[in-house]
């Protein structure tokens, strides 16, 4: 849905792989990957136990604080996301791999706290998800192939879930 809703930006990235936007996505992706490598054991075990409610609480505090922060701040017009903002948003995305922490919520909050414009930060946040989703899918496929395990999948259910997620995603963005 991100690829469709933000197709103009996606085409810019494809046509100009060394543009500022493309470089900003790389800057955001690197810290996310590094944090995931460090936190991976915690991520895989955190669906159980006390960490989930703590992460929900962190998300709630971030969203409430960002809402207050944005209402009481005037933003300077900027041409786009700075590399510093991309780095900060990438760090937030890395920690958002913990269950209970909203990826888009935390990256948008990080972008706003670092002085970004709400609309630009939101678009960049959604674009940031694309490389991470692709890398995550590649990692999971690699693990399945390496282990030689291919779970049985309800294809019809998967197609329905994909279509619903796609439609809701496009409408939401």
Task: Walk through the language-model features, giving the residues of each.
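Multi-pass membrane proteins that catalyze or facilitate reactions on polyprenyl-/lipid-phosphate substrates
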Residues: 1-173
